[in-house]
Amino acid sequence: MLAKRIIPCLDVTNGRVVKGVNFVELRDAGDPVEIARRYDEQGADEITFLDITATSDGRDLMLHIIEDVASQVFIPLTVGGGVRTVEDVRRLLNAGADKISVNSSAIANPQLVSDATARYGSQCIVVAIDAKRSSAPGEAPRWEVFTHGGRKATGLDAVQWAREMATRGAGEILLTSMDRDGTKSGFDLELTRAVSDAVPVPVIASGGVGGLQDLADGITRGRADAVLAASIFHYGQHTVGEAKAFMAREGIPVRI
């Protein structure tokens, strides 16, 4: 079995790392370069860096911050937010990103995923899906895809959308439960399982980590290939090393 990855996530706006609850109520968590360096030293497998207001604000890419982070970090760096064209993908890769995450732009133009993977390879294109439960209690579970930092409903079914993106060449799915984001109540394991079982590519579980057991559950019960977390690492509740040691004790293969 391949080693499972632990990925700290840096949500960035106006050049600062922030953390919110259910995609709002953002509070400052520090300088992205400093935080990324700390996670690299702690043994993170990768870092995900999302400019969470670039799309909704219509802003350009934060290339200078990406260059600064990439110069300090020696593990794979995934960058997303405001990526609209294949040219944007090229600029971010040139700035030092290893993988590019697309979200709202993939829905506006699904061909972007096909074109970007054709040019740069599936291994560096991640499709981020922000999903919110849309089924009523007692109904078969359904989740709707949202865009623009969770502000815009699309009417798309999250599991079907993940399938389409994998068919178009996405190398990974970064799956965030909007219902769980920032709540520290654990991943939406039903959502994570539904998408993991539906696609042939790795799924990164995101949204809701409150403790180390939640990370392990994302792998063992959610069937994710990687787990992403922010606040438990940003505010010093746990280090990446502690998370890996816990997962190893749970019998999950990790790189120590």
Curated annotation (Swiss-Prot):
Gene: hisF
UniProt-listed GO biological process terms: L-histidine biosynthetic process
First-listed, main subcellular location of the protein, grouped into a coarse class: cytoplasm
Enzyme Commission code: 4.3.2.10
Family: Belongs to the HisA/HisF family.
Subcellular location per the Swiss-Prot or TrEMBL entry: Cytoplasm
CDD domains, sorted: HisF
GO MF annotations, alphabetized: imidazoleglycerol-phosphate synthase activity; lyase activity
Pathway: Amino-acid biosynthesis; L-histidine biosynthesis; L-histidine from 5-phospho-alpha-D-ribose 1-diphosphate: step 5/9
Keywords: Amino-acid biosynthesis, Cytoplasm, Histidine biosynthesis, Lyase
Subunit details: Heterodimer of HisH and HisF.
Active-site feature positions: 11, 130
Reaction(s) catalysed by this chain's protein: 5-[(5-phospho-1-deoxy-D-ribulos-1-ylimino)methylamino]-1-(5-phospho-beta-D-ribosyl)imidazole-4-carboxamide + L-glutamine = D-erythro-1-(imidazol-4-yl)glycerol 3-phosphate + 5-amino-1-(5-phospho-beta-D-ribosyl)imidazole-4-carboxamide + L-glutamate + H(+)
Organism domain of life: Bacteria
Keyword Cytoplasm: yes
Residues in the signal sequence: none
Name of the protein in question: Imidazole glycerol phosphate synthase subunit HisF
InterPro entries recorded: Aldolase_TIM, His_biosynth, HisF, IGPS_HisA/HisF, RibuloseP-bd_barrel
